[in-house]
Amino acid sequence: MGDYEKYIVKPFDWAERPLIHHDREVMNGLGPLMAFLNTDMVADADLNIFIHHIDVKTPPGPEYVDVHAHDVSQAYVFPLPGIRFEVTLGDEEHVVDSPATVFIPPRLRHTVKIIEGSGIEVSIVRNEKYEQSLAEDAGG
């Protein structure tokens, strides 16, 4: 193995692992959540990248993410057309059709709900471990 081969990793199904502020049972009902990068995969990683394959069979989709904030920035990326979602940023609610990206600055309270459609959601959170990124008491 070369010096840098350790930086090439394969995703794995997050399956039944917990994810703070997320209802995993409901998420699993929408489709699998795959971990593409975290410190379990690459010890030096300072990003957590998840891809959620989503298929809302009966609109509107269920709520599965509690309002929360991180001490670091986050981005939700919906790269393909086919999903309508609602994102709450602070006290503002926005309904958005994919493709779209939502940048969430550090400490901004937020949540996301998939209203209808099918496709993928990419979540990118800065920090070594997702749990370490959560803000205790964030305004906004």
Please identify what each model-predicted range represents.
Residues T58-P59, V95, Y130-L134:
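Short, surface-exposed beta-strand/loop "edge" segments at domain boundaries and coil↔beta transitions
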Residues G61-P62, L89, P105-L108:
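Short acidic (Asp/Glu) patches
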Residues M1-P18, I115-G140:
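Double-stranded beta-helix
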Residues V72-S98, A135-D137:
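A short beta-strand-loop-beta hairpin characteristic of the jelly-roll/cupin
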Residues A35, N48-H53, Q74-F78, T101-F103, ...:
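Ordered hydrophobic segments in well-structured contexts
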Residues V96-G117:
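Conserved metal-binding segment of the jelly-roll/cupin
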Residues G61-D71, V87, K113-I114:
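Short histidine-centered beta-strand/loop micro-motifs
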Residues M1-G61, V65:
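A short, N-terminal "cap"/entry segment at the start of jelly-roll beta-barrel domains
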